[in-house]
Amino acid sequence: YPGHLLYLEDHTFRNKGPAIVGMRVLGGRVHIGQKIMKLDGTPIGQIKSLRTRGSEDVKEGRQGEELAVAVMGPTVGRHIEEGDEFWVDIPASHAKRLRKLDLTPIEEEILEQITLLHRKNDHFWGR
């Protein structure tokens, strides 16, 4: 599923290996195993785990939830900063299938933004 995340201020729990940071799901959904990218399309890393405020492991985060997200790849302060926003990086083959599903209007908007971003480099992405 498409998703939009915000890295919360003062919510850095570990800097790297994996980086564990507090994030709010601004729209859509986020799952373990998904890759995330900056709003300009720069790849960041892969989500390894999601935890709620009560330290409970979850498989999925939905819009409005605040989670501790373990991301393999980036170093806080070098690759990502507090206040950064991210998209879930969807593979082109999944974008085709997602269009056929019953997405919420916000999820459709996020998918459209991700599609536009990828089509700058590949005109046929997700078709």
State what each model feature region is.
Residues 2-127:
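Beta-strand/loop-dominated core regions that host nucleotide or nucleotide-derived cofactor-binding catalytic loops
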